[in-house]
Amino acid sequence: MTEESEETVLYIEHRYVCSECNQLYGSLEEVLMHQNSHVPQQHFELVGVADPGVTVAAEAASGTGLYQTLVQESQYQCLECGQLLMSPSQLLEHQELHLKMMAPQEAVPAEPPPKAPALSSSTIHYECVDCKALFASQELWLNHRQTHLRATPTKPPTPVVLGSPVVVGSPVGQTRVAVEHSYRKAEEGGEGAAVPSAAATTTEVVTEVELLLYKCSECSQLFQLPADFLEHQATHFPAPAPESEEPVLQQETLTPAPVEVPVSQPEPVPSSDHSYELRNGEALGRDRRGRRARRNNSGEPGGAATQELFCSACDQLFLSPHQLQQHLRSHREGVFKCPLCSRVFPSPSSLDQHLGDHSSESHFLCVDCGLAFGTEALLLAHRRAHTPNPLHSCPCGKTFVNLTKFLYHRRTHGVGGVPLPTTPVPPEEPVLGFPEPAPAETGEPEAPEPPVAEESSAEPAAPGTYRCLLCSREFGKALQLTRHQRFVHRLERRHKCSICGKMFKKKSHVRNHLRTHTGERPFPCPDCSKPFNSPANLARHRLTHTGERPYRCGDCGKAFTQSSTLRQHRLVHAQHFPYRCQECGVRFHRPYRLLMHRYHHTGEYPYKCRECPRSFLLRRLLEVHQLVAHAGRQPHRCSSCGAAFPSSLRLREHRCAAAAAQAPRRFECGTCGKKVGSAARLQAHEAAHAAAGPGEVLAKEPPAPRAPRAARTPITSPTTLGSAAPAAPAAPARRRGLECSECKKLFSTETSLQVHRRIHTGERPYPCPDCGKAFRQSTHLKDHRRLHTGERPFACEVCGKAFAISMRLAEHRRIHTGERPYSCPDCGKSYRSFSNLWKHRKTHQQQHQAAVRQQLAEAEAAVGLAVMETAVEALPLVEAIEIYPLAEAEGVQISG
């Protein structure tokens, strides 16, 4: 009985607030230590110190001895009884005696009073502030105080609300602490009377008192436990709303767990910021262990009913099933509600993140629900939630909200995205020694997982190996194959997240997913200290430091750090471009690239600077702009590709494709992020942004393919010449599967084919604003405009001669180097430029055409001569039949 009372007292722990700065503390010792910083060094009045044979008045009048020592050192006074103590630890032990007395218990004979800290031979007494009577123990003093409370009843103080504490004054006046104290005499307690002296109170029976913290605002009735108070409040409010006006003390006393954590993880202790805290973790542990012991005690009558009223998540006790159900909803749905919409969240951080959707920083607004998003891509992904069928369904039964993840999943089924048929397996067949995973934390028993039989799927491909029939993967052990089939090819997802309802195959996946709700990132990178929420994400991140790219394409040899990126890359070789731009016809294999491309048509980029009217396609470019233009600092640039980053950490995380391909493109556009190979090209590209409008200049320009420099070298001769390409630096072999419908020429990208088709259609969408001449590509227009401006940005390092086009500079450099990379396959003559080779090839073409015409003329003349010479002779029948139509066509009459 005593242990239960002590545990109950620990559960309804006090909260202490500093009266000077309103700072909250979980224990009296902490607040007293804190208040020493506010209290100047002063002497306090000793309430009562008596020595055998010496009165208190005489000791005080003498001004010497023990009294002066206590006056100088004692700075800690109990607010309940006024006793002065020497240290915070003694005051804490003294306060626990008050708490033990406040617990409801049967009247028992008084035990000898606990010994106060002995100071020489003196004894500390307790003085009544009303009648100045002295008592030898706290129990007798509290019993005497009840007589004054019954004689002059006073209204109990209002429960403390955080932010506006009620300060309880003390005789000292310097260590005032806001504590919730409301007492009343127990109705079944013994009757005690005031004792004028310590000698007369040695046989006094201790009267029990109880701590009443909760007052009903309707009927002013007092309650000790929050469960009793809530049960009573239900009588006044039969149908409370989900956000009912519950007192703040309920939230301060209850300890809900915002997130359902796994059993293997330690249970978090609520922090003081959420207004429900206990004194320390040990008190919480003792409280929970005591409740579990009482709940598991089957010997008590009604133990089964009591066990049903305990919350399995936080061990909270409730008096009715309705209260328990209402409490369980807080674990499932959350307890923090958005004031602007009806959504609830499990933690304040989730609510703060959600409130950012309502802020004015978002530019794209959903017309159905009012939520705003920072980019158009997020808005389009959110808009699908308002459609009749918001989920992407796969034929295998899985559903996805995100389109990208749905496309990733479909590729696991192979060509067509249709899952292969699986062999049905009896559910009763045992698994090969593999233990069943623990059931999900829903409290309901789940059906056993259908195991996979070895006879139906484990076909030995080689001695000692087992092959999976679904993906042809081989394993060295049957147990490994069984585990692979259970967790890779299993269609159902048994483990559910208690916060958002998302399903997972493994319980470990649920634990990793829960960290996205709690914000926990327990796996830091040893190189840059960046934290991650799972070991897999950490391992993927560490590849950026080591430079390792374990996933390599078998067609072009390009390597990647993730298998999903490799799967996306293979779509390029498969010529799978399902996303088409409606304005210019350019196709993309990823949806976000189409969204990025659409900004070039509209001319409005999503990330706008607050200090100037400029906008940017990427957030990184906006941060770099603010760093350079408004902060006057230099960004961190990649030495391989020239990309700029606002911090060195972002630069270290940068995965440079140019460095891997050894083809640096060192100049990046600060507006759209496009990289070019020279400063002149960058200036021309930025001039296009600054032209009449980005929509007019860049709208019809498809994004240039980011191929290596060697692949862009013009070495392919026209098909009309019908000859091989001249000798040039060899480029990596690439598949060319896009064919022109007019000339049957093949191209590797949709962009190259789109530009080539303008040759047949005659389309020239880029006119010069100075002379009106039109061009098929925007780069040709940029080169042409330099003729009007006289700009020659490309200068030779040897002779200083400048050119308007970089290609002319490259041809000029060959004069100094003597290089002639373009040779004629007919005569072997070589040239410095492809245009000179083209002109030279035309001479061979003209000679070839002249020779063909001469041969045709000679053949025609020979046929006519043969007819004229043999017309008078008798010819065989077969020759006559062959010559007759020819002679008739020439107008020659053949006599018979």
From Swiss-Prot:
Post-translational modification Asymmetric dimethylarginine, affected residues: R832
Positions of C2H2-type zinc fingers: 16-38, 76-98, 126-148, 214-236, 309-331, 336-358, 364-386, 392-413, 466-489, 495-517, 523-545, 551-573, 579-601, 607-630, 636-659, 667-689, 738-760, 766-788, 794-816, 822-844
Residues bearing the modification Phosphoserine: S164, S298, S717
Region listing for Disordered, in residue ranges: 259-303, 434-460, 687-733
Entry keywords, A to Z: DNA-binding, Metal-binding, Methylation, Nucleus, Phosphoprotein, Repeat, Transcription, Transcription regulation, Zinc, Zinc-finger
A Pfam family this chain is assigned to: zf-C2H2
Keyword Nucleus: yes
Similarity-based family: Belongs to the krueppel C2H2-type zinc-finger protein family.
UniProt name for this protein: Zinc finger protein 574
Organism: Bos taurus (Bovine)
